[in-house]
């Protein structure tokens, strides 16, 4: 159990350092990077067949962070800010460990931001759209009443249902 958690932590640190552009010293730079990243993800054209690998790696990093947080919460109840501070780290923290902790904290903030969660939902909808498209069309066909179906087809002339009675019908 501990070996698996250590492997996850090492992988997360490697992924965090591979995306070094996400790390910054000041809060303003972090917010600017976050908004730039999220606007680029939201405005870029997304292929229905596949998602670019950097977006999926960011989603994987966020799921890995959430897995680490859920494992820490199983041992005891902590708040989000306390998860990093209450973990057992070496007594003598060097610069590398501090940078790793800062990187993990910044990635947590990006993953928990509302804009990223909104983008994640949009991404799931786009990936599932191909599978659900046929099902939705079938449901719509069953739910539309007869009159609404007739109004969809403008090419067909509409026949009167009630004929006026005239003197020549006797």
Curated annotation (Swiss-Prot):
<keyword id="KW-0165">Cleavage on pair of basic residues</keyword>
<comment type="subunit">
    <text>Interacts with NTSR1. Interacts with SORT1. Interacts with SORL1.</text>
</comment>
<keyword id="KW-0838">Vasoactive</keyword>
<dbReference type="Pfam" id="PF07421">
    <property type="entry name" value="Pro-NT_NN"/>
</dbReference>
<feature type="site" description="Cleavage; by MME">
    <location>
        <begin position="160"/>
        <end position="161"/>
    </location>
</feature>
<dbReference type="GO" id="GO:0005184">
    <property type="term" value="F:neuropeptide hormone activity"/>
</dbReference>
<dbReference type="GO" id="GO:0005576">
    <property type="term" value="C:extracellular region"/>
</dbReference>
<dbReference type="GO" id="GO:0010628">
    <property type="term" value="P:positive regulation of gene expression"/>
</dbReference>
<keyword id="KW-0964">Secreted</keyword>
<protein>
    <recommendedName>
        <fullName>Neurotensin/neuromedin N</fullName>
    </recommendedName>
</protein>
<dbReference type="GO" id="GO:0097746">
    <property type="term" value="P:blood vessel diameter maintenance"/>
</dbReference>
<comment type="similarity">
    <text>Belongs to the neurotensin family.</text>
</comment>
<keyword id="KW-0968">Cytoplasmic vesicle</keyword>
<dbReference type="GO" id="GO:0030133">
    <property type="term" value="C:transport vesicle"/>
</dbReference>
<feature type="signal peptide">
    <location>
        <begin position="1"/>
        <end position="23"/>
    </location>
</feature>
<dbReference type="GO" id="GO:0051897">
    <property type="term" value="P:positive regulation of phosphatidylinositol 3-kinase/protein kinase B signal transduction"/>
</dbReference>
<dbReference type="GO" id="GO:0043679">
    <property type="term" value="C:axon terminus"/>
</dbReference>
<dbReference type="GO" id="GO:0010629">
    <property type="term" value="P:negative regulation of gene expression"/>
</dbReference>
<comment type="function">
    <text>Neurotensin may play an endocrine or paracrine role in the regulation of fat metabolism. It causes contraction of smooth muscle.</text>
</comment>
<feature type="site" description="Cleavage; by ACE and MME">
    <location>
        <begin position="161"/>
        <end position="162"/>
    </location>
</feature>
<dbReference type="GO" id="GO:0071855">
    <property type="term" value="F:neuropeptide receptor binding"/>
</dbReference>
<dbReference type="GO" id="GO:0007218">
    <property type="term" value="P:neuropeptide signaling pathway"/>
</dbReference>
<keyword id="KW-0732">Signal</keyword>
<dbReference type="InterPro" id="IPR008055">
    <property type="entry name" value="NeurotensiN"/>
</dbReference>
